Amino acid sequence: MAKIAVLGYGTVGSGVVEILDANAESISKKAGQPIEVKSVLDLRDFPGDPIQEKIVHDIDLVINDDEIDVVVEVMGGVEPAFTFVKRALEAGKSVCTSNKALVAAHGAELLAMAKERSLNFMFEASVGGGIPIIRPLNQALTADEITKITGIMNGTTNYILTKMSNDGSSYEEVLKEAQALGYAERNPEADVEGYDACRKIAILTSLADGRTVNFEEITTEGITKISNEDFAYARKLNSVIKLLATSYRKDGKVYAITAPFLIDTTHPLYNVNGVLNGIYVNGNMVGDVMFFGAGAGKLPTASAVVGDIIDCVKHKGTNVCLIWDDEKLELAPTRDEVRSFFVRVKGNTSDTAMVKEQFGDVEIITVDGLDNEFGFITDKMTEEAFDKAAANVDMISRIRIDDTKLQ
């Protein structure tokens, strides 16, 4: 029998315990032996919960327990998670985690520690919740050079943008609703400012390339400035606005960005709505591959964690190699990226001379009820060229356009 410890008995931790109990028979067959939760580390007690007899409050009771083979870190945050995970690996225990902040900050180091000790550090649930994406990149798609990854990787922001698009509600209204439903945290900054999705694309890009991407160097913009007026133009253009986390390789350089994008009905992520996530991957041989499903939530995320636990038990004493080392991947500057932009400017449609002087003979777009402003879509240009031209017009807002198409 394999024995594990769970660090954190919150949403995901309790889900892990629930799945191991509910699916015990099938999990035992897949792992080759039964899996038992021996200890659960938490600051709290849980009187009346069957798990109470396994609750411990001291990490040393986990680290020093030679019976524990696998440690499951589902506490979140970088510390003390990083310290606890390092200690677990040093003590000869494999580790599974759903913690994208930990993986984005220390993934390469922890993978190296695990490899040196013939252990495993697994993190399928850190990106996409229940959507399998880490394993496909590391196993099924290893014959390919990955040329592009773009995804809706945050359910909170996708829910907010979907409701704004469909119902015409304001950002502030939908955020309050999302918080009431449990889709958004009391402090939603990590989600709505794009930081959560940024960390996830950093992890995927690091795995796809094999070198470490510093998530702090990825251009990141959130959704807090997206307005109902922006969606009015989007509807006029048969498009929607999505927070996309994207990286791609072009001319030997790797670019990465997390920001709101305007996408039309031909885009592979157009119909990914609500709290669902979708991730598009292009490989130079396989072509286009799509991953779609629940990107968060208790049981979907816990399911991915339990999948990692099973892998750790099956491969005890053997490292399942993930190619991601600590060599830094230098990202190309965002200013050099080439794309089109949707732009809203103040003014009357009878006076578009300055816009056309700066951006060429663009088509002017108007929306009924929105007075003293108009919109247009630029030709493809670098971000640097756009910023220089936009400085000469009375711009209200701009949204990048992603024109990814399934091949």
Feature annotation, model-predicted:
Residues 146-150, 158-161, 165, 177, ...:
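Catalytic, metal-anchored helix/loop core of enzyme active sites in primary metabolism
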Residues 309-407:
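A conserved regulatory-domain signal marking ACT and ACT-like small-molecule sensing domains
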Residues 1-90:
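N-terminal glycine-/serine-/threonine-rich beta1-alpha1-beta2 phosphate-ribose binding loop
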Residues 94-96:
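A short hydrophobic/small-residue beta-strand
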Residues 7, 73-75, 98, 105, ...:
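Structural motif
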Residues 68, 115-196, 203:
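Rossmann-like NAD(P)H-binding beta-loop-alpha module
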Residues 175-271, 276-278:
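Substrate-binding/catalytic subdomain of NAD(P)-dependent oxidoreductase enzymes
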Residues 81-87, 91, 100-138:
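Rossmann-fold NAD(P)-binding glycine/threonine-rich loop
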